[in-house]
Amino acid sequence: MAEDGSEEIMFIWCEDCSQYHDSECPELGPVVMVKDSFVLSRARSSLPPNLEIRRLEDGAEGVFAITQLVKRTQFGPFESRRVAKWEKESAFPLKVFQKDGHPVCFDTSNEDDCNWMMLVRPAAEAEHQNLTAYQHGSDVYFTTSRDIPPGTELRVWYAAFYAKKMDKPMLKQAGSGVHAAGTPENSAPVESEPSQWACKVCSATFLELQLLNEHLLGHLEQAKSLPPGSQSEAAAPEKEQDTPRGEPPAVPESENVATKEQKKKPRRGRKPKVSKAEQPLVIVEDKEPTEQVAEIITEVPPDEPVSATPDERIMELVLGKLATTTTDTSSVPKFTHHQNNTITLKRSLILSSRHGIRRKLIKQLGEHKRVYQCNICSKIFQNSSNLSRHVRSHGDKLFKCEECAKLFSRKESLKQHVSYKHSRNEVDGEYRYRCGTCEKTFRIESALEFHNCRTDDKTFQCEMCFRFFSTNSNLSKHKKKHGDKKFACEVCSKMFYRKDVMLDHQRRHLEGVRRVKREDLEAGGENLVRYKKEPSGCPVCGKVFSCRSNMNKHLLTHGDKKYTCEICGRKFFRVDVLRDHIHVHFKDIALMDDHQREEFIGKIGISSEENDDNSDESADSEPHKYSCKRCQLTFGRGKEYLKHIMEVHKEKGYGCSICNRRFALKATYHAHMVIHRENLPDPNVQKYIHPCEICGRIFNSIGNLERHKLIHTGVKSHACEQCGKSFARKDMLKEHMRVHDNVREYLCAECGKGMKTKHALRHHMKLHKGIKEYECKECHRRFAQKVNMLKHCKRHTGIKDFMCELCGKTFSERNTMETHKLIHTVGKQWTCSVCDKKYVTEYMLQKHVQLTHDKVEAQSCQLCGTKVSTRASMSRHMRRKHPEVLAVRIDDLDHLPETTTIDASSIGIVQPELTLEQEDLAEGKHGKAAKRSHKRKQKPEEEAGAPVPEDATFSEYSEKETEFTGSVGDETNSAVQSIQQVVVTLGDPNVTTPSSSVGLTNITVTPITTAAATQFTNLQPVAVGHLTTPERQLQLDNSILTVTFDTVSGSAMLHNRQNDVQIHPQPEASNPQSVAHFINLTTLVNSITPLGSQLSDQHPLTWRAVPQTDVLPPSQPQAPPQQAAQPQVQAEQQQQQMYSY
């Protein structure tokens, strides 16, 4: 070991020679040393991102603001090692004063034990101080006392009450004529407003005049409570105490937040007074003229002095502090109607003054909304007594519940808690206080008053998730859900927001005795007595519930449904359930058209004209948030504020054009528009858009997004007891449970069809509106429901994942497989009473009866006029009598502009040897295909002499059947089947009547030559109807669009340009194929961009070349007279490339 004063020698142990060496091993050499990486201390690594540490010129370090810090920004709590006594006091010592009075010291000597707040330097002068340190509970916090601009160093000093406990002086104001205590140096008035205000009764100092006013009113209350003989003594300390210059006087105990006055039990029959810590931070400014105020206060002649009774003497001090013209405080200031100097009277005095002065001022100025806000938690109250009662909750909680160890600040709160929470052995007769609105019962009257059930709309809205609540207490409970889940159940590890809820949940896992104290639950241990709640059974139906409260709610369902929805007629047991139900109707307004919306609004008693001026505003997240910028009035609910600005200021607010709701705030309106998916590119709306990063769905609040994300976790903890289906959320399970009921309470206003769930009704309404949000990526077909789109997509893949283990049959859907299994298990139990056909499920039987046996209005075949009575008969007729006809209808061209030019004045059919027959198209029947006449095959000599009518709507001609050039086996002569029919109904742009229609005469008929291996069995014709709506005209040009049906490949092709692709023959097919062709012309027409342009390889649709052999030049048909002037189609134009989609 080295001697004292010498450097310590580091010895290194060598494993090889088993010796210590002071430098290096003589045989193996030096040791390679690896040092740790540099790690910031805890104090420096915990620095917030908007702060930074800078080194000053004198070498010291300070904390500086990077961004703007507004006033009343709180930092903390201060973290450090806590000791009973300091070894060495720091430059800014901190203590925490416990309930028993013993202080605990903060050891700030080590940066690794503290957070960044230890690096903030204390202020030396008052103008340098911008942070205030104070104790709250068992921690110390820093709060900004003014706005701090970027680049300013943070400097801290003690708050007034905390400085008194720490026995530290307040900082003095440098360069002003006011002492640190706020007492003027001389009697001359100070021009500038002092930064601190002093009480002339007890010399307490205050940073704000408002705090001094409320403090003086406390002295007034004390003077009023003293007997008459003692009042002279109460007014004695009116002299200004001589204080040494630069040394402030000791701050009295009255300046502490947790004052003795707050800890006193309030006297019976008297409202507790408001201490200075309870001062309102949001005060309504009074805009009444100052002359009127002077007139109110003038109760004495101008020259008559005022008697100096103690209460009036203190009120003299109050008014003297508020009068800018006052220079003598020995008497009440004299106000006259003709004073030239203006009088400034703070609204805080009007709101807080007592007795006659307060009554007189309120009587003259009129009642105004009063706002009282807690200094500590910023909670708002409507009156000072509630604020006084609330502030005590931030102080010491001396009353402990013996049952659950919960602490209370008032004994009354403890009694109410014990009576309400721990009276489980009382009989049901003790529930004698019943709510007249929802019929909920309570044991004590105060619990009924706290219940505060409302019958009007939910007006309290959460700022996080925008959810509405009927009472402020329910909103406060709900807000805790947005915090962290800190309490875990020891049995199942489930997390909770509140400890009391966790303990109640944990009791459900326990078995044994009936009563268990919460101390035993918190202590835990192996010897913990098990407890289980005694179940409660319904006396009507016998259903068992885990607790009596749930049973009481269920018991209401056996009573009469007294509350009826005026919109849909549905009845409810409780009015709060009815109120929630009415909100569902408003959610579906967006799916209605203008007529339906007007009818709906009229049904609920609001007209659209009145809606512009008298619409209600959804309530805000917290009462008293709305403040009118013009008259400074505040409102507790949004509809009150909206009514105010409409009636008083003649403003209309912000109205939603979709659902006709109106909002007073623009921010609320923008958040509402996210629901309708409107104005999403607007930056004002985008800040309310919260997209899901997994599926891309957007929400207008973080709370709704977080609830949605539960679906993506894959955890489905809520299972249906009837079918076993699981869900991620409890509300989804409740919605699903309606599926098992046979009650279809949700009726469609369009068709009257009943739905079991609101979700199903919303999707059903989309069908009536034609809203199809989901598109197949393969064929671009759109669907209204996602489940139908997913089922459709499986047809493209051909994957069948589900197999019946009994017979081996595979299915693409699980529900289809489950239905099939019923054949093996229960058999076909449902028999048709008409034809004795049997089915597995009742639904299949109902569909059979509906389609087969139910008589409907007689339907006529559009081709031959045959009338049938059922849909099944019509399908059977078309299948047997007209197998060659395929109808393709275009019913909706809403996406096209008003005037459209389609690059297709004709639709040509490329087929072997076709014959087109004339059809009589009835006038005024727009969109219906003409009846098909009988097929006629004329001989060539008859064709030549056949006259062509001049007024024919369609050209009629026949061509001689030609043989195929290649060998196609026995199918050569039968390849040409029935006549190809093309019926096109278009709006005539030359006719003014929109309902008129003309036949398209420019039909291209092209015989084709196929390869030897190509086989045809049944070439199906096309009937195209409703190509345009009666309100819209289409301008046509002379270009030709040809549609080809390939029966081998089963695809439809378009011809519009020369064939420039070499085609290879196809292999021979084994058997002829009969193909049913479907072509979506709506997709074709709407996808041409720009309209009128030629189709090309760069078309938005996916096109592929279809093999085709060289096309023979067509034989020209005999053209009718009206077609004589049209140009003939050249042979080279017939050799076109075919594209399939």
From Swiss-Prot:
Taxonomy, superkingdom: Eukaryota
Keyword field contains Transferase: yes
Zinc fingers typed C2H2-type, residue spans: 197-219, 372-394, 399-422, 460-482, 487-509, 536-558, 563-585, 626-649, 654-676, 690-712, 718-740, 746-768, 774-796, 802-824, 830-853, 859-882
UniProt biased composition (Low complexity): 1121-1141
Tissue specificity note: Detected in all tissues examined.
GO cellular component, one term: nucleus
SUPFAM superfamilies assigned to the protein according to its UniProt record, in alphabetical order: beta-beta-alpha zinc fingers
Location in or out of the cell: Nucleus
Biased amino acid composition, Basic residues: 262-274, 927-938
EC number: 2.1.1.-
Biological processes, Gene Ontology terms: methylation; negative regulation of MAPK cascade; positive regulation of canonical Wnt signaling pathway; positive regulation of transcription by RNA polymerase II; regulation of stem cell division; regulation of transcription by RNA polymerase II
Location in chain, cross-link Glycyl lysine isopeptide (Lys-Gly) (interchain with G-Cter in SUMO2): 517
CDD domains: PR-SET_PRDM15
Keywords: Activator, Developmental protein, DNA-binding, Isopeptide bond, Metal-binding, Methyltransferase, Nucleus, Repeat, Repressor, S-adenosyl-L-methionine, Transcription, Transcription regulation, Transferase, Ubl conjugation, Zinc, Zinc-finger
Start-end of Acidic residues biased regions: 609-620
Residue ranges, annotated region (Disordered): 224-283, 604-623, 922-973, 1108-1141
Compositional bias segments (type: Basic and acidic residues): 236-245
InterPro entries: PRDM15_PR-SET, SET_dom, SET_dom_sf, Znf_C2H2_sf, Znf_C2H2_type
Protein purpose: Sequence-specific DNA-binding transcriptional regulator. Plays a role as a molecular node in a transcriptional network regulating embryonic development and cell fate decision. Stimulates the expression of upstream key transcriptional activators and repressors of the Wnt/beta-catenin and MAPK/ERK pathways, respectively, that are essential for naive pluripotency and self-renewal maintenance of embryonic stem cells (ESCs). Specifically promotes SPRY1 and RSPO1 transcription activation through recognition and direct binding of a specific DNA sequence in their promoter regions.
PANTHER family found in the cross-reference section: GROWTH FACTOR INDEPENDENT 1 TRANSCRIPTIONAL REPRESSOR, ZINC FINGER PROTEIN
Protein family membership: Belongs to the class V-like SAM-binding methyltransferase superfamily.
Protein name: PR domain zinc finger protein 15
Organism: Homo sapiens (Human)
